[in-house]
Amino acid sequence: MPAIRIVHRSSLAPAEAWKRLTDWERHGAQVPLTRTIIETAPPTHVGTVFTARTGVGRITFDDPMEVVVWRPPAAASRGASSGLVRLVKRGRTVRGWAEIEVRPLPAGGTEIHWREELRLRGLGRAFDPLVAAAGRFLFGRALARLLRP
């Protein structure tokens, strides 16, 4: 599976960065031709399921995901801490996992680590470098937009 690793720094506090990065509906708005369908009642928790549906018209594919780790950062009033969410991709077309981790920076702000490994059905390992490059571009752009003031 191609590995996608993105590190991004933000002036936002960890709790605010977390709030923005785990707003699943906003994720769909950042990826071209994609919308997110939340299938579990809020708030997000272990077991939450949602699907990113990408496509045009009747030509679409679904990327169903389940939250398997949900550890939000502590509120700033209790001393900022790291947060981690892990998603497992359970679709027919897209398989793998993704993690988003927020870490407080000593001088304020947050360092975000986005890690993802995915396999696209029908694409052999020869396409891994292309899939990884496209993923870094798309997810990096989505990350920056989600954190934008």
Report residues per predicted region.
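A conserved amphipathic terminal alpha-helix motif
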Residues: E117-P149
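Generic recognition of short, well-ordered alpha-helical interface segments
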Residues: L12, H45, D62, F137-R141
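Juxtamembrane/interface motifs at transmembrane-helix termini
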Residues: T36-T40, V49, V131-A134
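Short structured motifs
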Residues: I4, T36-I38, T51, L84, ...
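Hydrophobic pocket/interface hotspot
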Residues: A17-L21, H27, F50, V67, ...
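Hydrophobic ligand-binding cavity/cleft-lining segments
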Residues: M1-H45
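Hydrophobic-ligand binding "helix-grip"
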Residues: P43, G55-E111, E117-L120, R148
